[in-house]
């Protein structure tokens, strides 16, 4: 799911002279699938200011607070996106002891939809969430976009031919 082999082949020019490609996955049954989700993946690093949480909490700016606010905002966004949208996230880094305001927090976000066009609209709103979380926490952020995948465009007639000859 995350190696994106066909994307790498496309980038290297493997499909230059090809009009149609048939994709196969091992399965105990013979089936055809007409769906594949578009995906945008982001790694977001919030940068705050470290401070002792008991002795001088007002001097700190919590990068982790910003990341948690972003997570919560994604939860609120779920009600306002197309039904087929999927949004996932995880904390990949937030070092330090619990009594120190963390100056770094890293989250990974995966946004998916069966429509690249619809997903692009969700991505716009997601980017505003990250900006807002940083603003609310008085921190800065870096964002790195990972692979940007298009949804598969099925050729239903080919699916029918495949099943007729399976």
Model-derived features with residue positions:
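Histidine/acidic-residue-rich, glycine-tolerant segments that coordinate divalent metal ions
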Residues: 1-102
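Metal-dependent amide/peptide-bond hydrolase catalytic core
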Residues: 68-166
């Amino acid at each position: 799911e995350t190696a994106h082999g066909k994307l790498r082949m496309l980038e290297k020019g493997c499909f230059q002279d090809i009009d149609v490609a048939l994709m196969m996955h091992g399965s105990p049954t013979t089936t055809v699938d007409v769906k594949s989700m578009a995906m945008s993946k982001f790694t977001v690093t919030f940068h705050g200011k470290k401070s002792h949480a008991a002795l001088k909490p007002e001097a700190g700016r919590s990068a982790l607070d910003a990341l948690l606010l972003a997570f919560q905002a994604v939860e609120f966004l779920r009600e306002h996106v197309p039904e087929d949208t999927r949004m996932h996230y995880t904390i990949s880094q937030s070092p330090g002891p619990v009594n120190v305001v963390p100056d770094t927090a890293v989250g990974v976000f995966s946004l998916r939809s069966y429509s690249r066009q619809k997903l692009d609209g969700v991505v716009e709103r997601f980017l505003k969430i990250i900006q807002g979380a940083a603003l609310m926490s008085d921190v800065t952020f870096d964002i790195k976009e990972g692979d940007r995948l298009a949804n598969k465009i099925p050729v239903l007639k080919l699916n029918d031919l495949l099943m007729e000859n399976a």
